[in-house]
């Protein structure tokens, strides 16, 4: 009878139980100013449930959150997306993209705003 090491048995049991190892985190790429303009104009960023920010090509920002609609402005400055909602909820962000997934990262914050970049949805 062959002897198997405990580590080898544990590895096989782990793969059978949990599946193969997952690849490293998705590869996000930082967008330049021109890429931000090209990707966001006419599109929306949303969590697909509670909120959406619609980026019009003319720099108008329309936000929908929990049934409420608000307006603001957006522009690109120094390779960052800058949002002005008329309150303290604005600022400038680095934009990182991986497929349809998007992250807005603010300097000094470790928590990005995460969402999905998609064509504008029809809202009533």
Roles of regions detected by a PLM:
Residues 13:
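Structured alpha-helical
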Residues 2-9, 18-124:
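Lipid interaction determinants
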